[in-house]
């Protein structure tokens, strides 16, 4: 029996469950959204949407 467990994470941009992408601090960005963010021009209307979504990613506090 070959049982593969795939963990899905909720993308902070599209709010969909995906299993491929990157983690930034405590948030997840799916591969599709990562590619869209990288290829979007600053003059594109979608750029403001991506910036707003990415601003929800905060650096976790550092405790000593």
From Swiss-Prot:
Keyword Transcription regulation: yes
UniProt keyword terms in alphabetical order: Metal-binding, Sporulation, Transcription, Transcription regulation, Zinc
Effect of residue 14 to A: No longer inhibits or interacts with sigma-G
Keyword Glycosyltransferase applies: no
One GO molecular-function entry: metal ion binding
Quaternary structure, from the entry: Probably functions as a homodimer. Interacts with sigma-G factor, recognition occurs via the first 71 residues of sigma-G.
Protein name: Anti-sigma-G factor Gin
Organism encoding this protein: Bacillus subtilis (strain 168)
